[in-house]
Amino acid sequence: MAYKIVVDSGHGGEDPGAVYPGRQEKEDTLRLALEVGRLLEAGGQDVVYTRTTDVYQTPFEKAQIANREEADYFISIHRNSSPRQNQYQGVETLIYDKSGIKLKMAEAINGALEEVGFRNLGVKERPGLVVLRRTNMPALLVEAGFINNDQDNQLFDEKFTEIAGAISEAILGTLCLLYTSD
C-alpha cells in the first residue's frame, strides 16, 4: 500500500538554520530530504516535498502543505546544534507526544541511525513545535546529528548514502509493520 509522505527540509532561503564553518543547516537538510524522498519513492510511496530548492517557508506554511495534500505522514529533516562546538553529538527525533505510529517510527529511525554510527539521544516530545502541532497527521522531526560537532559532520559526509537509507528504510519498515497488522 502506498502512503502519501511529506518530506520537509528544515529552514531555507534567508533562514540558514544552524551554521558552522563551511556548512549551513538548510543545505544539509535539503540534500538529505531529497535523497530520503527519492528512496521512499523507490519504495513505492507517494512523496511530496515542502521544498526542492533554497526557498524559505514558515513552519505554518509547511504544516499547511502537508494538510492540504492530505498526507498520511510528515517527516521533517533537520540538523541539531548546541551552545558550544563539540558539546553534544548524536541523533534524536522529536514528536508531539510519545504515542502511536509516530513513536514507533521515531524509535526505528533513531535505531537505524545508531547502526550507521550516530549516538542515539532518543525520542523527545516537543508539543510546541508548529510542524508537529499543526499537522493533521503523524509528524516527526529528525535531528540528523549536530551541525557543530566535528564527528557528527564527518559521519554525515562520509556515510551520507547510508544515513538516507537508514531513515527511509526505518520509515518503510514501520509502514510495512502497520500495513501487515491491519
Q: Whereabouts are the PLM-identified features?
A:
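Catalytic-core environment of secreted peptidases
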Residues: 2-20, 75
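Active-site-proximal helix/loop segments of hydrolytic enzymes
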Residues: 3-4, 27-181
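Glycine- and acidic-residue-enriched helix-capping/strand-helix junction motifs
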Residues: 17-31
